[in-house]
C-alpha cells in the first residue's frame, strides 16, 4: 500500500504487517515521483499487488501503473476530490 501526503518522508514512513495470509508493506510518499519510485522498488522485490491511497488521482494512478506494468497489479482507493486534502485531487497537489 502506498499513501501520498504532504511532508511525508518516504525513508521513515514505512511499516510491514505480517499475517498468516499476507504481508502488507506500507510506504508513505510526498509526491507522485516518490510514489512511482516506491512502486518500482516494491515490484522489483517481488510484490505482485500494489494498492494506492485515494490521494493518488487519475494521473498518479496511471504513472504508477505504467511504471510497474507486467510486474505488479495496481489498484486504488478512490475519491475524485479527497476530503483529507481540502477536497482537491492528488493530481492538483502532488505532481
Describe these PLM feature segments.
Residues 36-39, 45-56:
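Amphipathic, hydrophobic secondary-structure cores in small proteins
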Amino acid at each position: 500500500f502506498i499513501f501520498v501526503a504532504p511532508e511525508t518522508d518516504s525513508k521513515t514512513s514505512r511499516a510491514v504487517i505480517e499475517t498468516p495470509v499476507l504481508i502488507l508493506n506500507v510506504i508513505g510518499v510526498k509526491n507522485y515521483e516518490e510514489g512511482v519510485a516506491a512502486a518500482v522498488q516494491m515490484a522489483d522485490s517481488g510484490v505482485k499487488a500494489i494498492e494506492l491511497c485515494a490521494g493518488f488521482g487519475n494521473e498518479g494512478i496511471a504513472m504508477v501503473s505504467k511504471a510497474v506494468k507486467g510486474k505488479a497489479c495496481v489498484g486504488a482507493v478512490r475519491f475524485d476530490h479527497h476530503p483529507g486534502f481540502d477536497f482537491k485531487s492528488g493530481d492538483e497537489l502532488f505532481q
